[in-house]
A protein has these predicted regions:
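ABC-type nucleotide-binding domain
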Residues: 82, 365-642
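Hydrophobic alpha-helical transmembrane segments of ABC transporter permease domains
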Residues: 32, 51, 106, 110, ...
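Juxtamembrane helix-loop junctions of ABC transporter transmembrane domains
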Residues: 20-28, 52, 59-75, 99-146, ...
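Helix-loop-helix
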Residues: 77, 184-198, 268, 272-343, ...
Length: 642
């Protein structure tokens, strides 16, 4: 947009290695909100998962405890028999095998259910995100990098997938395992349990220190990744500009700078995270060795009633106890990273939606036998404003296309006004042209008509109705807009034209294309109106894309047109074709036109000259030329340049 706007804000990123690190705000609140999303739709599934986790954990504990019985009651007595019978031992092994099978089945069922819960939750979150995104005001997209928004849908949502499918189930499983194993160890030998707990305390201390360091960098990594994605998208969209100005090296330098920051934060995060498992594993081995040594001494001396079977069962439990503690430490980093992603997700979801206090609606209308406007259920070609009043009555006013600005002031950011005391009107069927230097405020005025932004002072009336009273969807439905930057969607040519009015028939779309003089080039495409367009219509010329945008506006058949730089990017021959089509389209409609080529607005009913957000001249082409003011300078300069 040519006008002054709020500066694009890139989210706060991590500072240098010695500076303060970003932190997740209210991690407990974030986790509670995530789980609320899960429980809202999958509470029965989560209960079943919890049961499976408990069964699996208890099966593992029971299998470890069975070692004591196996050794003390079966194996040792068999060694003392001259002709031992293996039948009792085989029966015992079958029983322990059944325990393991139950644990495996519970773990398998748990994994299957969690896949369903995780993917369903992420689907719901993405749907909520997209639904909310569609309700956000244009100002949000003007002030947030699009790549950063995309990163929320991809990277941040993916970190939640890891947390929901792996980290949280693992934490729950570890917690249940730790409690059950601890109780079993105490039952076997409280002395050996004390030895184990001393080593566990050391493991927890080391894990806490490592997690504190890695957590800072995981958050920084997530935010740096968003910046890299934003930069890549920006360079992809502007690749032609980069090549035209031969700034490939400059673009590469910018990417390397961001990529190096991502590498540094990721390296630091993973360096700390990757040493956690080896450290805990070695501490676990030390704990195992100490317990084996102490247990053997106790078994030999008969201290505390410890037997060889007790020692073997306890050592198995010792491994089962140390493993979940290591897993908890490892999953802590994943959860911190996921919470950083969740913070960005919920921050976007908590952005205030576009407000709409309007209550006047646009309806299909017809005249009854008394020549009064009444509401119609079918499309009649007559539009009317349905205006309910405080006294309970409702009036209908035919949509004419009369737009008036009265003492309008506006600024994109508080304290910085870009439009000052704007007074203008567009009567039904008139063509109003805005001209002026770049940044004068031309496009800003059109943004106010469709309420992409709201004014700070003054009034804008549409058919005598304050536009703040008109529901935004109905206001915009009455406007046909050809934006400065033409955007085409993935789909056929016909579908892109029909986007202007989704219920339009093929015949109406073709008629709109003919009106815009696009029918000729469309028929020359490989599949005509069924030709697929991808990548924003990259297989079409700029002029052809502009013609399709005009056809899209034409099929909506609006009473008011806003043409923002509609022909500024089209060659002279194509412009002549477009101009003839546009003249037909604008006939009988209120039209607001912005164009760099002043020759395209010579036949305007009124030309408004803007400079630094103020109207400095207005009148017809001949009147303004006779004044020899700003318009004269622009016009003669334009002619000389051409």
């Amino acid at each position: 947009m040519a006008e002054q706007k709020a500066k694009v804000v890139h989210g706060p990123g991590p500072r240098g290695m010695g500076g303060p690190r970003p932190k997740v705000e209210n991690p407990g609140k974030l986790l509670k909100r995530i789980m609320a999303e899960v429980f809202q739709h999958y509470l029965p599934h989560c209960i079943l998962v919890l049961i499976c986790i408990v069964v699996s954990a208890l099966a593992n504990v029971q299998a470890s405890l069975f070692l004591q019985t196996l050794i003390d009651d079966y194996i040792i007595p068999m060694t003392q028999q001259q002709d031992p019978s293996f039948a009792p031992l085989a029966g015992a092994l079958v029983r322990v095998g059944c325990i393991y099978v139950v644990g495996i089945l519970a773990a398998w069922l748990n994994a299957r259910i969690m896949v369903n819960v995780t993917q369903g939750t992420l689907r719901n979150l993405r749907t909520q995100l997209f639904t909310h995104m569609e309700s956000l005001p244009i100002s949000y997209f003007d002030t947030h990098p699009h790549g950063d928004i995309m990163s929320v849908y991809t990277n941040d949502v993916d970190t939640l997938r890891q947390m929901l499918s792996q980290s949280i189930p693992q934490l729950v499983s570890s917690a249940i395992t730790i409690v059950s194993v601890f109780a079993s160890m105490c039952m076997l030998s409280w002395q050996l349990t004390i030895v184990t707990m001393l080593m566990v305390a050391l493991m927890l201390f080391c894990s806490k220190k490592i997690t504190q360091q890695s957590g800072k960098y995981f958050i920084a990594q997530q935010r740096d990744l968003g910046k890299v994605n934003g930069y890549i998208e920006e360079m992809m969209e502007g690749q032609k500009v980069v090549k035209v100005f031969t700034h490939e090296q400059k673009a590469l330098e910018g990417f390397r700078e961001l990529n190096d920051k991502l590498k540094d934060s990721a390296k630091q995060a993973n360096s700390f995270a990757n040493i956690m498992m080896p450290v805990n594993a070695q501490l676990g081995n030390i704990s195992y060795a100490i317990c084996a040594l102490v247990g053997a001494a106790m078994a030999v001396t008969g201290m505390g009633g410890v037997t060889l079977g007790t020692v073997m069962a306890f050592l198995s439990l010792n491994k089962s106890f140390n493993m979940p503690i290591s897993q908890v430490s490892m999953q802590a980093n994943s959860i911190i990273m996921a919470l950083a992603g969740a913070e960005r997700i919920f921050k976007m979801m908590d952005e205030p939606s576009e407000t709409d206090e309007g209550y006047v609606t646009l309806i299909n209308a017809k005249y009854d036998k008394d020549d009064n406007l009444v509401e119609a259920n079918e499309r009649t070609g007559i539009w009317a404003w349905k205006h309910p009043h405080h006294d309970g009555t409702t009036t209908y006013h035919k949509l004419e296309g009369d737009i008036t600005f009265t003492d309008v002031d506006f600024g994109y950011v508080p304290g910085k006004t870009v439009l000052h005391d704007i007074n203008l009107y567009g009567r039904p069927g008139q063509k109003i042209a805005f001209v002026g230097s770049t940044g004068a405020g031309k496009t800003t005025i059109t943004n106010l008509i469709n309420r992409f932004y709201d004014i700070q002072d003054g009034k804008i009336r549409y058919d005598g109705i304050n536009i703040h009273k008109i529901r935004k969807a109905d206001l915009r439905r009455s406007l046909g807009i050809v934006l400065q930057d033409t955007h085409l969607f993935t789909g056929t040519v016909m579908e892109n034209i029909r986007y202007g009015r989704l219920e339009a028939t093929d015949e109406e779309c073709i008629a709109a294309a003919r009106l815009a003089n696009a029918d000729g080039f469309i028929k020359r495409l490989p599949d005509g109106y069924n030709t697929m367009l991808t990548n924003d219509g990259a297989n079409l010329s700029q002029g052809q894309r502009q013609l399709l945008a005009i056809a899209r506006a034409a099929v909506a058949d609006p009473p008011v047109l806003i043409l923002d730089e509609a022909t500024s990017s089209i060659d002279t021959r194509t412009e002549a074709l477009v101009q003839r089509g546009m003249d037909g389209l604008m006939y009988g409609r209120t039209s607001f036109v912005i164009a760099h080529r002043l020759s395209t607005v010579r036949n305007a009913d009124c030309i408004v000259v803007l400079e630094q957000g103020r109207i400095i001249e207005r009148g017809s082409h001949d009147e303004l030329i006779a004044k020899k003011g700003k318009y004269y300078q622009l016009y003669t300069g334009n002619l000389a340049e051409n």
